[in-house]
């Protein structure tokens, strides 16, 4: 087991966590093969894990968490609203949803890091919260996650491509109604809508929509938006033209189709694809690039914000206790002379982050964190 500080120091402590197998890449398209279902581990992050994280997230004064509807099997679809003033009529509004395809769990980890970045006790995060309202659905299809499906909901349907059905699946209807609620007849409607996925190609990229399916003006906006995010992760995110879609016409079955038919250039609605392979990682870097790029696109200037990282002058990570443990263990972190920003996370032996215990400023002294 590896415990990791954001101050670029790795601590290894002697307790064991099972290996998480890498997925096999068969071809270059969104998701993983349908036959590769995984009933035993819910793709590494299940609905109960989400409920545990909700307990942590809702401790922040800047988060409102509520169910926006229910799935086929009756599970709540949870939405986080992150802002210092969620009732503002001037703040820029952004919507992000992830895990429509259960097997594309990398999309969740990027989304998770977006949440961590927005909730951090840092000047930039505070400035963003004071100018924006982020709505985030970390798990759009929890039934599919719990059933071990790669792309489908409990009815066995791919809800990503069901936005034009005569009778909408519950998960599609819930999200569509929420989009309408936050876009129709309010002074600050959604301006950016990101649909988080991951793909076989083992690349990070946005799905660019050709002008034949949108407009020449929108493609100019797309290029600026994608290139603006890539600017913050130049060697990690592909160029805007890496994956071009809608080159012959406008399809009508996707979330982005719905956005285009209803709001056209007024909403930057795009799919983001992370790496769906064993090389996936750097989710925090990707998340920060996305948030910064979104802010730039919306005219929120972070350049003048003082975001000097406060690094503790002396620190120590204590041995966890009890060890071995079942079902929980306690980990003490000591900052000896001054406080500072820390990120304490649990990482498996393959380097995959499985739990964030802390991502904020803590004062000098001993702070205990529990993991179960």
Please report, for each region that a protein language model flagged, where it lies by residue.
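Glycine-centered coil/turn sites that cap beta-strands in beta-rich domains
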Residues: 306-321, 325-346, 356-359, 368-371
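Boundary at the C-terminal end of the N-terminal hydrophobic targeting segment
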Residues: 20-22
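Bacterial N-terminal signal peptides
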Residues: 6-18
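Short proline/glycine- and polar residue-rich coil/turn motifs
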Residues: 70-72, 360-367
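Soluble metallo-hydrolase cores and metallopeptidase-like ectodomains found primarily
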Residues: 41-94
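Short, acidic, Ser/Thr-enriched surface-loop or helix-capping motifs
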Residues: 71, 348-349
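Active-site/substrate-binding loop(s) of hydrolase catalytic cores
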Residues: 72-76, 88-248, 252, 256-276
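His/Asp/Glu-rich mid-to-C-terminal helical/loop segments that flank catalytic regions of hydrolases
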Residues: 278-302
């Amino acid at each position: 087991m590896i415990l990791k500080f954001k101050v670029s120091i790795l601590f290894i402590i002697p307790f064991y966590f099972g290996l998480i197998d890498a997925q096999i890449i068969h071809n270059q398209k969104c998701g993983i093969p349908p036959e590769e279902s995984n009933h035993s581990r819910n793709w590494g992050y299940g609905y109960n894990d989400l409920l545990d994280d909700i307990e942590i997230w809702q401790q922040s004064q800047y988060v409102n968490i509520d169910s926006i509807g229910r799935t086929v099997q009756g599970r709540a679809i949870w939405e986080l609203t992150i802002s210092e003033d969620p009732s503002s009529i001037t703040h820029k509004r952004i919507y992000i949803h992830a895990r429509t395809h259960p097997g594309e769990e990398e999309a969740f980890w990027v989304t998770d890091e977006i949440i961590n970045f927005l909730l951090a006790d840092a000047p930039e995060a505070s400035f963003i919260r004071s100018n924006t309202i982020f709505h985030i659905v970390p798990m759009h299809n929890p039934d599919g996650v719990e059933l071990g499906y790669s792309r489908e909901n409990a009815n066995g349907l791919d809800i990503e491509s069901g936005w034009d059905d005569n009778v909408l699946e519950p998960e599609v209807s819930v999200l569509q109604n929420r989009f309408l609620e936050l876009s129709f007849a309010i002074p600050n409607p959604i301006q950016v809508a990101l649909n988080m996925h991951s793909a076989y190609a083992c690349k990070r990229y946005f799905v660019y929509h050709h002008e034949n399916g949108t407009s020449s003006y929108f493609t100019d906006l797309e290029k600026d938006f994608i290139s603006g995010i890539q600017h913050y992760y130049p060697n990690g995110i592909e160029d805007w033209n890496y994956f071009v879609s809608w080159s012959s016409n406008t399809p009508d079955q996707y979330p982005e189709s719905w956005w285009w038919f209803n709001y056209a250039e007024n909403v930057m609605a795009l799919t983001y694809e992370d790496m769906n392979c064993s090389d996936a990682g750097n989710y925090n870097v990707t998340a920060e690039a996305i948030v910064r790029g979104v802010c730039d696109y919306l005219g929120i200037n972070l350049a003048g914000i003082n975001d000097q990282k406060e690094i503790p002058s002396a620190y120590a990570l204590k041995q966890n206790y009890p060890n071995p443990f079942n079902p929980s263990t306690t980990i003490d972190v000591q900052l000896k002379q001054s406080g500072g920003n820390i990120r304490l996370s649990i990482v498996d032996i393959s380097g995959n982050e499985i739990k964030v215990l802390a991502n904020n400023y803590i004062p000098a002294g001993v702070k205990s964190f529990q993991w179960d």
